[in-house]
Amino acid sequence: MKNLIFSIFFKKISNSEKHVDRFNKLELHYNRLVQKKIDYANKIGADFRLYTNNDLYIDFGDKQSFNTDTSWSSFKNKYRDYEFDVLNLFKIHLLEKLAKEYDNVLYLDMDVIPNTKRNFFEEFDMNKICVRSINATTEVLPMNFQKHIKSGKKTYIDIIKQLDRYNEHVKALCKKAMLINQNIACKDYELVNTGIVGGNSNAISQLKFTDNLEHMLNVLKETKEEMFYDKDITDYFFPNNEVFFHYLLDKNNLNWFNLPEKWHKINYGSNDSKISNEYKKYKMIHLISKEFDELWKILDNNVEK
């Protein structure tokens, strides 16, 4: 069986202050973030590749090698209007491409830190797309927002106005609206986080993300024009890989598995999501907060089996 773990590290591709800060933190911790993934791949007998925005990927085999791959340039030129977000659309495109080369593939965002010796490919059924999904109701909003809604101090729309387009609840609403556009009932607020995605070649091929990308862009455009939700909500909708990914799971009733939190622990960096010694027990830690120094302090004293 040929197994691959891959990640993507791109130099700054957005002028947004928020994104620039995150790219800078990734660059600062680059060596350790890469080494953690190399070490994990070696432990479980998988190849590891790191893709860059120089149309190169680094193959960390017995002898580190640099290889040309123009997938990024081709994809970026086609979807250049989406700036930072084209990177997240691209990673799913690349997942599908690599699944044609390997039996099993695991994608890890650069800010995901493996913290286990256990083999992801053996732990879960690779016949299913393995990804963590969160039921992104208003219960996922920061506690102070939830309290305002429950107390009636602020309306739901007042709270929405204080969020941004990357909020999970907002993205779940976008997915629901797109499904409604296609006359598909959606009773939940489930939304995948694509920081960790795995599966075998056949499972990943069922997604057909790249094949359906133009379709999804058109559905999104129609959805925004229909304005099923309030304008303040609809204005947040944009081409997001997680929205599109879960839209396809629901629309096509695909076979997928919801990874347990132990294998995809997300840290957002809010007051409700502090890094603590509890993090030692998690197998994969996704630091959206980019608070790497805090995590290193804890993991340096951890011996995980």
Predicted regions and their residues:
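N-terminal anchoring/stem segment of glycosyltransferases
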Residues: 1-90, 97-101, 236-238, 288-292, ...
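C-terminal active-site "lid" helix and adjoining low-complexity regulatory extension at the edge
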Residues: 296-305
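GT-A fold catalytic core of metal-dependent nucleotide-sugar glycosyltransferases
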Residues: 82-156
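Catalytic core and acceptor-binding pocket of nucleotide-sugar-dependent glycosyltransferases
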Residues: 168-296
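Charged, glycine/proline-rich intrinsically disordered loops and linkers
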Residues: 16-21, 60-82, 139-183, 220-231
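Short, well-ordered alpha-helix to beta-strand connector turns
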Residues: 45, 102, 127, 194, ...
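A structural signal for short, well-ordered beta-strand segments and their strand-loop junctions
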Residues: 5-6, 47-52, 106-109, 130-132, ...
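Short catalytic/ligand-binding loop motif for oxyanion handling, primarily in non-cytosolic enzymes
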Residues: 13-15, 57-61, 114-117, 122-123, ...
